[in-house]
């Protein structure tokens, strides 16, 4: 005999199902469930008097020797990923996602994809949202607190460069030379996050860059503050092609070594990741945004200019002066800073993101951006664009799935593809490391509930440890057991070049973390950017007005006075 529940009651018990939508935070974005792997009436729910008990939803006989038995089940999760928005149980074993579907006891339940046994832990995610851990490709390694601040907004992987608050690191995302690369690899070995380091891409000989890749750098960064010259770019790209590592560039704002067209020529059709492609963070003034229309260029943004608000322009000038070691008493330094801040290109940047012409969102952490705001700014921008541009094609009332999948890809799968780590992380897919972020829908985009690294709870909202329950105040994000001891080494990854990996860099310098090589970075095009592969035929920036035109049509938007996911979430 069946038991009937109305839709609202079912959602309260088991989470949304097909036909339901979930509002994301206080935005006007709604995620509609596209598929539900649940068998109604046989949901795997944990708790007193519930299903996941011995001999019911939990197998009474299967041991962990059975590879179908998982270490952790995340039950009833609403998964938001570039691959889709679905409702499913997630099975984790040995730190990786081994199944997405339906978990339980095959002796008592139908259509079970993986087994819950005596060795299985349960995380109840009914009514909660699960995303892949965020990846920030543009981090200045200035403060050792960056990983924790990133985790506070769901960032689990950091790529960038630096050695601490040295002036070179304050300005550029480069870790220069074997000594610094070695020491920084050792420094982050006990930090609960994934890391990759970018070499300094300068010089008229390839050897000066090659030695850094051999030392363990996972990519190369050419930056104007060290000189973004034709020779430096060309030689860095030669090394990137030889060793299969990513190449990123912060181009020449002053146009001293050449103009945008000269830099484009230096690329020679090779794959390039352009940082802050709008230009306020740096790059050819005023027309770096032209790069967003090139097939061989993978363009990213930094979060200080996203979304475009009434206060955005005001803070940018001071940021540039401090970040790039400029002197307000020198008129030329002030002119340099002013040349980079253009409200017209900032306005166009929002729209290009919404079109899918800008593929990646990053922070530029501590050097004009905030590592703890990558995810939040991404969803604020999506919300602003829905309000100003309306639904994307294929979206409808209470269904913004196309826009949601486009924006989640900007800080998960696309940065993973760009830096050659998509085989390991970047999406909620079977076979990848279980770097997962669990959100309450009301807090989505602002404050995670739990963060898993390599299948282990590492950060999360936790109450007073001296209380009788985990819920009493103050409930704040705190480190959990995965952030301590040898667990850090077993659940986090250091990414290096294939050369360094093959030549035993882990043993050579005494690393304890998982060490993995980056790969498949050199034959990428804009078409490889998931749901963000639009390459306009022509992008033109008027040199006098700085207005942006795509195929001769003006591209702009208005600044907003208030954003979603802002003050009501951060009272202090």
Swiss-Prot record:
Protein's pathway? Nitrogen metabolism; urea degradation; CO(2) and NH(3) from urea (urease route): step 1/1
The record's active-site residues are 324
Quick one: which residues bind substrate? 223
**Co-factor remark:** Binds 2 nickel ions per subunit.
Major enzyme class? hydrolase
| Keyword Metal-binding part of the UniProt annotation | yes
The enzyme's E.C. designation: 3.5.1.5
As for subcellular location, the record says:
Cytoplasm
Q: Which residues form the signal peptide?
A: none
Chain sites annotated for binding Ni(2+) 1:
138, 140, 221, 364
Enumerate the catalysed reactions.
Answer: urea + 2 H2O + H(+) = hydrogencarbonate + 2 NH4(+)
Subunit structure, per the record? Heterotrimer of UreA (gamma), UreB (beta) and UreC (alpha) subunits. Three heterotrimers associate to form the active enzyme.
Task: Report the family membership.
Answer: Belongs to the metallo-dependent hydrolases superfamily. Urease alpha subunit family.
Instruction: List, alphabetically, the PANTHER family matched.
Output: UREASE
Q: What is this protein called?
A: Urease subunit alpha
Q: Which organism is it from?
A: Streptococcus thermophilus (strain ATCC BAA-250 / LMG 18311)
Its gene is: ureC
